[in-house]
Amino acid sequence: MAKKSKNLLAALEKIDSTKLYSVEEAVALAKETNFAKFDASVEVAYNLNIDVRKADQQIRGAMVLPNGTGKTSRVLVFARGAKAEEAKAAGADFVGEDDLVAKINGGWLDFDVVIATPDMMAVVGRLGRVLGPRNLMPNPKTGTVTMDVAKAVEESKGGKITYRADKAGIVQALIGKVSFDADKLVENFKAFHDVMAKAKPATAKGTYMTSVFITTTQGVGIKVDPNSL
């Protein structure tokens, strides 16, 4: 614990909490100040001036990062017949129907993404209390309720991320790993920023992005100048 605190203090000394860093500076600092002994995740956080209680100010969606996430997602698909075969051929890790419902209700959660064909949502709906709180419930807005299961599986395996504003209007997203080249992290960051900018609700008032941060697992938040993105 003492060693971790020492590393954290060393990281804090290199970061000026009053400064807005350019995206290139912020990414370089995030990599430099990472002290985790594993390939830490790199994440961004957007504090948005929105009121998520209003239906037209809820922000939620999905995108495929240009350089992936560095993470291999375990994909589960609820489908039957030909669609089940398509999912398997596309590389889905688990494909099934009621058998998977029983398994999940029994406590099994060894998957990262859940996809379903529209006709299976009545079955998947029985898992609302399990999948909902974990942000795993399939949703048309994130492309996880679809007839094109092959595309959904391939995107989930190839760097697709989902995002959603929480009650405080904060959106967090994974943009890669510390081991990524800096330019690839910058490219991913800029791609996500473009999505956030376009997601601005028409009814949002005042400054939309109040602050933007980048951090690594166990790392320190670094404030980024949105204008550099």
Curated annotation (Swiss-Prot):
The keyword Transport does not apply. Binds directly to 23S rRNA. The L1 stalk is quite mobile in the ribosome, and is involved in E site tRNA release. Protein L1 is also a translational repressor protein, it controls the translation of the L11 operon by binding to its mRNA. HAMAP family: Ribosomal_uL1_B. Keywords: Repressor, Ribonucleoprotein, Ribosomal protein, RNA-binding, rRNA-binding, Translation regulation, tRNA-binding. GO terms for cellular component: large ribosomal subunit. The gene is rplA. One of its GO terms (molecular function) is rRNA binding. Pfam families: Ribosomal_L1. This is Large ribosomal subunit protein uL1. The keyword Ribosomal protein applies.
